Amino acid sequence: MISVSGVTKHFDEVHALDYSDLDIATGEFVTIVGPSGCGKSTLLRIIAGLINPTEGSVKKPDESMGAFVFQDAALLPWRNVQKNAELLMELEDGFSKHERVSRISSALQQVGLEGFEKSYPHQLSGGMKMRLSLARSLVLNPDYLLLDEPLSAVDELTRELLQEEIHTLWKKENFTAILVTHNVSEAVFLSNRVVVMSPRPGHIIHMVDVPFKKRDQTLRSNPKFTKIVNEISGKLRT
C-alpha cells in the first residue's frame, strides 16, 4: 500500500496542497483529476519522492521499485529506441548485459515497438514516442508506476488506443498505477478509483469507485460509464 498522510506543500508564497490523505492498495489503478493548478502533479511528484512535502508523509512498501512517466516523453535524440529504453537501467546497478537485452526486448514488445529498435526519436510518431517512454519505465519491472498526463500530446484516436494498451499492461503486469490527467473520460476508462481534487490549495474532495471489469472501446458508449463521467465532471465544476 502507498499511504499519503496529511501532505501539504508550499512553494514560497504559493500554497499548492492542503492536508491531503490518500491510501492506494497494491495493484490498484487510481487516477487523480482536478482543475489546472490544483496541485495534482505536485502530489504525484511528492509520492514519487521527486520533491518533499512541507508537512505530512508518504509511506511506500520497503524496497519497492517505482517509475515515473512524464508528460513529455523526454527522449534523447542521439540515442535509438533500444538505447533510450536502456537509459534507466544504466542508472541502476546490478543488471547484467544479458538481463538488459532481455528486459528491453520484452518491454519494447509489450508496447508494440518491436522492429523499431534501431529507429531514432525523430522517426517516431507522437504515440510511438510515448510508447517508448512507457517501455523505458517498464524495463525496471516497477512495483508502482506514476503517470503525469502522458497522453495529453497525442491525437484523440491514438489516445484511446494507448489507454487500452496501458490498461492491458496494468492487468498483465499487476503493478500499482497512479495517473494524473485532465481528461475525465480517460480517468474513468483506466481506473479502479478516481480521486477528485479542489482548486488550489488542492485537497481531495471526492472519490468514485469504477466497477467495470472489461475495458474496451464499447465501454465508452455504456450509459453507466457516461453517468460516472458526468458525476466527476459535476464535482469539478462545483
Protein language model regions, located:
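Catalytic Walker B motif of ABC-type/P-loop ATPase nucleotide-binding domains
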Residues: L145-D148
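Short helical segment in ABC ATPase nucleotide-binding domains corresponding to the A-loop/adjacent helical element
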Residues: Q82-E90, H98-V101, S105, D209
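Hydrophobic anchor residue at the start of the ABC signature
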Residues: L134
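Helix-to-loop junction immediately C-terminal to a conserved catalytic motif
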Residues: A48
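Conserved signature/switch motifs of ABC ATPase nucleotide-binding domains
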Residues: S119-H122, L140
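The feature captures the beta-strand-to-loop junction immediately N-terminal to the Walker
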Residues: V33-P35
